[in-house]
Amino acid sequence: MDFSQNHTKNSVESLQATRIFLFLSQIMRKTSQFILFLLLAVACGRTPSVDWTEGATEPDGRALHTLVLHDMPKGSRVWFQELFDGKTSVEGPSMNHYQGTSWYIDIPESGTVTLKYYGRPLPRRSWVPEAFVLQQQGRADTPMEVRYLFLEHPQTEKDEGCFASNYELQPADIIPQVKRVNYGTEPLELIESHPTGWFRITIGQGGEPKVECDDEDGAFYAQVTLSKLPRPLPPMTIEDWPDYAYRGFMLDVVRDFRTVDEVLEIIDLMASWKLNTLHFHIADDESWCLEIKDFPELTEFGAHHALPDWNLQETCALKPSANGKIGNTSFYTAEEYQRILRYAWDRRIRVIPEFDTPGHSRASIKAMQAYERRTGDSSFRLQDSTDTSRYWSAQDFTDNVLSVYLSSVYKFYGVVFDEVIRLHKEAGVPLPAIHIGGDEVPDGAWSGRDRHDMKEIFINGMLDLAEARGIRLAGWEDIVKGLKPETQERLKNSLYFINVWNTEGIEGFPVVLSPAAYTYLDLAYSDDLNEIGLSWAGYVDERKTFALNPNDYKGDIIGVQAQLWSSQLRSFEDATYQMLPKGLGVAERGWNGGYLEPFETAFNRFYSIIVAREMPVWERKGYVFKKR
């Protein structure tokens, strides 16, 4: 409204006051209506919610669980996440498996819906159905409140004697433990040859340290050692070096994403343990976590999560992972990835990205289907649309395997490899290898074609890419098994390492020990119901990781690695809890391959150092960790 100069000042002020009054009246009226709506919703119980009740284990080993859905709209659908366990409905509408951990229930009538179903007994409380979301046509998806009712279970008795921390520590007792120390001013007897990473620290009467080393790794490890020694420093000489050239940590950011800052904190922990390789698991079924500029759908589609549409199609994003998060953006831009690379390299840590193939490839398959829909370009297609294979993967997917006989698969990964090489080169950081996964290709994939021929085609196709670019590959042990002799020999020339559980039957390949029963940090600490984690390979605590003895294995062992898979994680706090303190056992075995004294004595010393010198640091930094 335009006011001319003929209007008086009073009329202008009066009109402005009237407008303000009307505006405030509207706000108050709408606020009152909203509050009234909330009060009515609460009073009438119209907010859909969930009650889940744990059932007792029956003689046949199953448990009858109960799921009650309150105030459900007719014709709606409820989604939730849970590990697949062959549920059998007994009462109420059926529970339908979609893909992976995703389930849905179609609601036939409004009101309260009760379901009873047989499933497995609950081994730990973190395995409950979770992330319930109400889906209605034409409306936004709505997370639902969930209440859990658990049975009373007897508590597992804790054997605290197994974790004594009464060893009398010396000033140089740190983790990893130093190999040679002499207190006083007498020098150590010098070793004739210096391994990579070797250093010597001499501390005189005045407490000033003198550092000797042969390379940048040794200089950094000497710095880490000095930062851990308690003050004041007594006169002493320390001489130390790593037993294994490869000391790794695998971080899965696909199933529960870690922010850049969280990754940097994990790198700091790795550096304090003198680990030197971050195996970065950034592409799998559940997500593709690295920006590739030529294929924006990899992250615009493959790193976003939403419920499938009403026709069970993933049209704009991938289905949720086990954590149930929807609408999240879970990937690293090229610049963020390079920031991680530089931060790690400053701490003498190399980064090896993993793109899991040819199984575990659902995110890339679905994303490139979206790319083809947008562009009409089928030359990067990853899955044959005419393939009628029927299979069920270890993680309960039926559509996650590359059609390795398509040349377009290798054209796609050529672009990916080129981008990764460029990012490392521009960051000024070496690229030791690209990890191609190779594990858990389900039986039934590539139906109608010889499975062994398909593996030969895949390995040779990836080797073509690597050799043309002068890079090396890495993979899980599956990639070397069942190959023709000529393919094995070719692979040896381009292979940096394979991650193995057991070296039996694997000869002539560089091996990084990664046995699940000793190095999978996502396995629960114990059978305590309140612990998070899986248990398919037993339980893993700091005693178990420390008990790994690489000397018990045959073969060309170049190192050891801890694995932190994230299907059971829901936060950074969960991640640090599963890492601390049991990750230190693997770090110790990478630096010091074995233990010379009796196990209980060696572990008592090791755990005493953790309690006295590691845990106070974690407390100050606010990390969540396992306390006893």
Predicted region positions:
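Feature activates predominantly on carbohydrate-active enzymes
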Residues: 153-155, 204-400, 408, 417-422, ...
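Acidic, contiguous N-terminal accessory segments
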Residues: 45-60, 124-239, 473-485, 492-494, ...
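Low-complexity, intrinsically disordered segments enriched in Ser/Thr together with acidic residues
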Residues: 105-126, 130
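Hydrophobic h-region of N-terminal signal peptides that target proteins for export
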Residues: 37-45
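Flexible, acidic glycine-rich loops studded with aromatic residues
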Residues: 478-496, 501-628
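Active-site neighborhood of glycoside hydrolase catalytic domains
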Residues: 393, 397-495
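Short, well-ordered beta-strand segments enriched in hydrophobic/aromatic residues
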Residues: 62-71
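Short acidic, flexible loop segments centered on an aromatic residue
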Residues: 74-95, 131
